[in-house]
């Protein structure tokens, strides 16, 4: 994915004419220097574009209006270099619909103790200019992020870069189209929800296409294209004897390749970047898409099983956020437990569809084995274990009056034994703070059995996501205590009830 190449972030300097043209000239010089340095040295995911100074209400309003209508603009970074009276910002901020970050910095790192005078003081007023800007944001109840630190500080760079990822993700989400092949798994509650409310809140659209429409595209794929893709499989994966040429399951691999090519063509033609399937709605497909889904996820598509469009959309969003970061992000399900005093574990997996981006093996195993659900031919799938280390699992649920994001911090561990009879990819983890507390908190908060698993993102990333989209977040980590967690759920009911 090269999605960050499609966007830029505008760097806006707030000032005023009170200090005279010489001060404004120096402000402009400083801004040019800082933007050039950040673009060159800070390893930001997006390019910063310096805009003209905002020194009057009309100038500021024009910048905000232009940002709204420029599809390449993912958001604004504002630096209050001098004091910039915040009433000048009201009209612009009222209309601004792009993410906003205040960079609370100043050009100099150290004070020039021997030479500091009032000219220096008037030029470098971030300390109180930023507070004036912060007041108007609070007064207007406008969500915006704040990063404090010198512009050469690596931690400030990382925080700005993290915010940029969120800003780009939000713009991508506004254009996201989710395709559901078939409907929801019958009688399942948590995977359903209000698609209209989701489009109003997040911007992504969700619509259903008959599986027959997909089958028509799958059947149009040429044998030559199928064989070329299977050649790619041969080079990327460890093929079991049954899947190799003349193997008894070779035809199943060919059919999986045809499904992958058909799915990708369908998604590309429709402009979809997330999709769902369900094993109860496979009419015309010879097998449940497993290998196809795994590979499409690795290419950046969002996915969830059983018609779970919220998790599919969340996976796409988190894939965009984590583009270029170390570690993978995948669809996941809490499947079964290992209870052992002091070593409780969760085994996560799904019927087939776990993304290879989280695999520890360089070449996962490609195999075809029986699947007792769905009533179709044995499906192809990739089998692998997961990288170890800190990770998160996240779930987005519809509570009717609002959306709630649940995040559990986890520690992925190595599987202590081989799993010779488990023919699916899997992840094994310890839930924070412990399995009883984590599972009870998750259940009390209504968390889904489907999640997005990520090594690339962390809790701070998901907090930013929730803040930027103005949704509730509940966190389960090493600091979680059930009595306080229950209290927080009750307080949230009151808070969000008042906001209706």
Swiss-Prot record:
CDD domains: L-arabinose_isomerase. It holds the Pfam family Arabinose_Iso_C. Its cofactor is Mn(2+). GO terms for biological process: L-arabinose catabolic process to xylulose 5-phosphate. One of its GO terms (cellular component) is cytosol. Binds 1 Mn(2+) ion per subunit. It catalyses: beta-L-arabinopyranose = L-ribulose. Catalyzes the conversion of L-arabinose to L-ribulose. Homohexamer. Belongs to the arabinose isomerase family. This is L-arabinose isomerase. The gene is araA.
């Amino acid at each position: 994915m090269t999605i960050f190449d499609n966007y830029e972030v505008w760097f806006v300097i707030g000032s005023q004419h009170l200090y005279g043209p010489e001060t404004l000239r120096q402000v402009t010089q400083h801004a040019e220097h800082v933007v050039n340095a950040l673009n060159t040295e800070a390893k930001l995911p997006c390019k910063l574009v310096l805009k003209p100074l905002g020194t009057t209400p009309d100038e500021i309003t024009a910048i905000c209006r232009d940002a709204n209508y420029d599809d390449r603009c993912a958001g604004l970074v504002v630096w209050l270099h001098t004091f910039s009276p915040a009433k000048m910002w009201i009209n612009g901020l009222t209309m601004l619909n792009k993410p906003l970050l205040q960079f609370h910095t100043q050009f100099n790192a150290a004070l020039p103790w021997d030479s500091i005078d009032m000219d220096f003081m008037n030029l470098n007023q971030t300390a109180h200019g930023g507070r004036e800007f912060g007041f108007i944001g609070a007064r207007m109840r406008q969500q915006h992020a704040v990063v404090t630190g010198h512009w050469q500080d690596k931690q400030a760079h990382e925080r700005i870069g993290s915010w940029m990822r969120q800003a780009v993700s939000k713009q991508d989400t506004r254009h996201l189209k989710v395709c559901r092949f078939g409907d929801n798994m019958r009688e399942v509650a948590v995977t359903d929800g209000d698609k209209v409310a989701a489009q109003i809140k997040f911007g992504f659209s969700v619509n259903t296409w008959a599986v027959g429409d997909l089958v028509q595209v799958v059947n149009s794929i040429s044998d030559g294209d199928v064989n070329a893709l299977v050649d790619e499989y041969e080079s990327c994966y460890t093929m079991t004897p049954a899947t190799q040429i003349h193997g008894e399951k070779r035809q199943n691999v060919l059919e999986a390749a045809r499904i992958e090519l058909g799915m990708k063509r369908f998604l590309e033609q429709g402009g979809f970047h997330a999709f769902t399937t369900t094993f109860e709605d496979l009419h015309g497909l010879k097998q449940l898409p497993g290998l196809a889904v795994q590979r499409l996820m690795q290419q950046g598509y969002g996915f969830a099983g059983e018609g779970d469009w919220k998790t599919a959309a969340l996976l796409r969003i988190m894939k965009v956020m984590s583009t270029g970061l170390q570690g993978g992000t995948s669809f996941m399900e809490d499947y079964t437990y290992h209870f052992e005093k002091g070593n409780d574990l969760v085994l996560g997996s799904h019927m087939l569809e776990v993304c290879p981006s989280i695999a520890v093996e360089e070449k996962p195993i490609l195999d075809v084995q029986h699947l007792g659900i769905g009533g179709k031919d044995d499906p192809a799938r990739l089998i692998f274990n997961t990288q170890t280390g800190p990770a998160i699992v996240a779930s987005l649920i519809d509570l009717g009056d609002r959306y709630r994001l649940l995040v559990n911090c986890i520690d992925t561990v190595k599987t202590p034994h081989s799993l010779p009879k488990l023919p699916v990819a899997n992840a094994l983890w310890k839930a924070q703070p412990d399995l009883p507390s984590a599972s009870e908190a998750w259940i009390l908060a209504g968390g889904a059995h489907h999640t997005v698993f990520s090594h690339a993102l962390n809790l701070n990333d998901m907090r930013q996501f929730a803040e930027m989209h103005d949704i509730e977040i509940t966190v389960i980590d090493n600091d979680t205590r059930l009595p306080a967690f229950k209290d927080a759920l009750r307080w949230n009911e009151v808070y969000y009830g008042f906001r209706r």
